[in-house]
């Protein structure tokens, strides 16, 4: 009996609550390099990652909307982007201890910089399916925002859109090239760079 209870206890320590459908959380921690086959389908965390990405964006937007009541859309969008960028999600995943739950091929870990952040998004997707939006938002607020993210501080940090675009390209396996077209000076005498961005077709990996 203890063997059956142990996963629930471990996930309780990670999440702060007992999961109802533990299968969702186990799937959230299953990297594509260790996919399993069930009824002819490959099972891994990619679908949950897709869902969690959207849910996390919505939750962070919700939190920022009520936190910064007079701020404009551009400010809110930039602040959200800084919170959900891949480097931040990787760090949060490690601080939570999520990295200890992920099942993956050892040869994958050496060159997958975003595995932990991707698993974190999958975890958000699992919580949403298991407990609903309100519960998921509470998890983000109490287990992520409150202990690890200073909203006032991060809202004032400069944001590098070029790095964000490169990060997006790496996640979706597309090559991005930048070509400087023109340099001008704005009304405050700051340089403004106009660049042309070329995005290639996604790379399809055979497995």
Predicted regions and their residues:
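Double-stranded RNA-binding/processing signature
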Residues: 1-200, 204
């Amino acid at each position: 009996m203890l063997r059956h209870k142990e996963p629930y206890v471990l996930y309780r320590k990670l999440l702060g609550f007992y999961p109802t459908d533990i299968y969702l959380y186990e799937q959230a921690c299953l990297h594509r390099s260790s996919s399993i086959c069930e009824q002819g389908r490959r099972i891994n965390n990619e679908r949950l990652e897709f869902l969690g990405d959207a849910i996390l964006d919505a939750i962070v937007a919700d939190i920022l909307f009520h936190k910064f009541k007079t701020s404009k859309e551009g400010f809110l969008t930039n602040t959200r982007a800084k919170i959900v960028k891949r480097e931040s999600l990787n760090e949060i995943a490690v601080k939570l201890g999520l990295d200890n739950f992920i099942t993956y091929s050892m040869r994958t870990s050496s060159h997958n910089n975003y595995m932990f952040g991707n698993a974190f998004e999958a975890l958000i997707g699992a919580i949403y399916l298991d407990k609903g939006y309100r519960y998921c938002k509470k998890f983000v607020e109490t287990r992520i925002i409150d202990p690890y993210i200073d909203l006032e501080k991060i809202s004032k940090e400069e944001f590098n859109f070029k790095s964000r675009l490169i990060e997006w390209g790496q996640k979706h396996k597309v090559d991005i090239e930048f070509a400087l077209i023109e340099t001008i000076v704005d009304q405050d005498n700051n340089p403004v760079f106009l660049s042309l961005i070329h995005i290639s077709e996604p790379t399809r990996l055979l497995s």
